[in-house]
Regions:
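A compositional/biophysical signature of low hydrophobicity enriched in polar/charged and small residues
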Residues: 1-165
């Protein structure tokens, strides 16, 4: 089986990625003007970036606080044994309130971000995780977020440019 090749990018590809991170609704014409290409050439590059999986999709950033008073909780999760890791990850992926989860190194196994309607909902979800013996959750340490200081809005352009041709 052939090794999967990492797509190579040039400076124009990086400009396209940076521009789309800032404004994913930009028209091809506006994008082409920003990066100095014809609309057709720009569209071909965008399609290539999409086909390669570098552009994985497009989303709207929803300001949830304008709709409700959600509770953001960051949970440090430790498993009793790594054998239950697959079951645990599947269960977490099925919980709509888990909007992000990372496996990490160190004294904990995962950091998960829960966005819930209230603390009672969060408590019920984590109790189910802890009480399920098939998941092997040893403990969950919760950190309730008070306010966002900085939110993710895209990767730094310098990181996008790491694999230039």
């Amino acid at each position: 089986m052939a090794a999967k090749r990492t797509p190579t990018l040039d400076r124009i590809d990086v400009k396209i990625l940076a521009a789309l991170q800032r404004d994913g609704r930009s028209t091809i014409q506006k994008l082409a003007d920003k990066v100095g290409l014809s609309p057709r050439a720009c569209l071909e590059r965008v399609r290539r970036l999409e086909a390669s999986g570098i552009i994985a999709g497009y989303q709207a950033l929803v300001e949830l606080a304008k709709l409700s008073q959600p509770v953001n909780v960051f949970a440090e999760i430790v498993l009793e044994k790594q054998a239950s890791q697959g079951r645990f990850e599947q269960r977490l992926a099925a919980i709509a309130e888990v909007v992000e989860c990372w496996e990490v190194s160190g004294t904990i196994d995962y950091i998960a971000r829960f966005v819930c309607a209230d603390l009672a909902t969060y408590e019920a979800l984590t109790s189910k995780l802890i009480d399920d013996p098939n998941l092997g959750v040893a403990r969950i340490v919760s950190h309730v977020a008070l306010r966002p200081v900085r939110r993710f809005t895209g990767y730094p352009e310098a990181l996008l440019a790491r694999k230039l041709v």
